[in-house]
């Protein structure tokens, strides 16, 4: 099985002018195509012992040219680490690598020439290869990171360390189901691959921003009529002083308020007048001797009795005035008689 051709259709684009990260998310059909069971790849850095360093150095000395000139990643193990496969044990991986070594022995006579040509044609390959070299150099992995979803392939030997490939399947409403892939490796390699794959999965489920027209407020054509700057509205108690323009809604409202104020004032004055009249009738009833003992007397009776009593008082006053005049004349007669008697 050609691993380079397997990775050719997923991670990289043959055209150098195209985007480095433009690719299509893998689906479940890729396992059926290569007759592989999905599992986690074997990390070249997690192989214990000194044998891993030997075959890793041989792979670096071979200098195989990757089918994708854009990447410059000439290590088959690195490509195998990027594109997970069904080789879950070290023995199977070494077997396939030895088969590749035997087939590539004619090309091993001049190992540095393809790399030199590639470096002359591509100035940015050296920096990418330096970032990818930590994946080829075997380094011990402290512990195995648990996977969030997917299936973990069982290894035949307990000493083998396994990198973690996280496969998170999202529910999509269309026919395609994008898969998010995270390659756990050296921090530089994680920065190289994980971020690029995350960028290609970014805009699949993005929503369109809301239209600016929907957020703009609608003009209100039914706004109430505003008052004129020169017009001053008075409080309800002083509505009589204001004189709004006739025929306007404000004038009708002010006239209604004026009617209400006038009605309130009229009711107050009427109640006050009735109270005063009642108190006067009560006082008049107390002055009439014939009505002092009656608690409930009609006003007409009180007025008639009071009138009669008043007329009687007037007659009595006249009689007293006439009697007084008589007494005064009698007094004058007596004074004149006294003086006449003294003159004798």
From Swiss-Prot:
Subcellular location: Nucleus
Keywords (A to Z) from UniProt: DNA-binding, Nucleus, Phosphoprotein
Leucine-zipper: annotated span: 313-341
Transmembrane domains' residue ranges: none
Main location group: nucleus
Classification via SMART domains: HLH (SM00353)
GO BP terms in the entry: regulation of transcription by RNA polymerase II
Residue span of region Disordered: 100-162, 209-261
Tissue/organ expression: High levels in oocytes, modest levels in kidney and low levels in spleen.
Subunit structure: Efficient DNA binding requires dimerization with another bHLH protein. Binds DNA as a heterodimer with MAX.
PANTHER family associated with the record: MYC PROTO-ONCOGENE (PTHR45851)
Name assigned to this protein: Protein L-Myc-1-A
Species of origin: Xenopus laevis (African clawed frog)
Taxonomic classification: Eukaryota, Metazoa, Chordata, Craniata, Vertebrata
């Amino acid at each position: 099985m050609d691993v380079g051709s397997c990775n050719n259709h997923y991670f990289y684009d043959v055209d150098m002018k195209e985007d480095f990260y433009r690719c299509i998310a893998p689906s479940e059909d890729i396992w059926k195509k290569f007759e592989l069971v999905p599992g986690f790849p074997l990390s070249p850095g997690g192989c214990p012992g000194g044998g891993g360093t030997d075959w890793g150095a041989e792979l670096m000395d071979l200098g195989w040219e990757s089918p994708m000139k854009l990447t410059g990643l000439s290590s088959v193990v690195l490509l195998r680490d990027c594109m997970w496969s069904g080789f879950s044990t070290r023995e199977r991986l070494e077997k396939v690598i030895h088969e590749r070594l035997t087939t590539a022995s004619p090309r091993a006579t001049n190992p540095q020439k393809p790399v030199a040509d590639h470096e002359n044609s591509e100035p940015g390959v050296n920096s990418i290869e330096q970032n990818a070299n930590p994946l080829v150099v075997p380094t011990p992995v402290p512990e195995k990171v648990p996977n969030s979803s997917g299936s973990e392939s069982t290894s035949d030997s307990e000493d083998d360390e396994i990198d973690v490939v996280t496969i998170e399947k999202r529910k999509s409403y269309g026919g395609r189901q994008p898969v998010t892939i995270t390659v756990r490796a050296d921090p530089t390699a994680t920065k190289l691959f994980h971020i690029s794959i995350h960028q290609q999965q970014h805009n699949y489920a993005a929503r369109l921003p809301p239209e600016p027209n929907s957020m703009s407020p609608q003009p209100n054509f039914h706004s109430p009529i505003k008052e004129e700057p020169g017009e001053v509205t008075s409080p309800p108690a002083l509505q009589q002083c204001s004189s709004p323009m006739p025929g306007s809604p404000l004038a009708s409202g002010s006239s209604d308020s004026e009617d209400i104020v006038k009605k309130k004032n009229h009711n107050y004055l009427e109640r006050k007048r009735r109270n005063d009249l009642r108190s006067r009738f009560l006082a008049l009833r107390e002055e009439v001797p014939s009505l002092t003992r009656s608690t409930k007397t009609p006003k007409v009776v009180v007025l008639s009795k009071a009138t009669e009593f008043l007329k009687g008082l007037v007659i009595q006053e006249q009689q007293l005035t006439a009697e007084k005049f008589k007494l005064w004349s009698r007094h004058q007669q007596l004074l004149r008689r006294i003086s006449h008697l003294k003159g004798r």
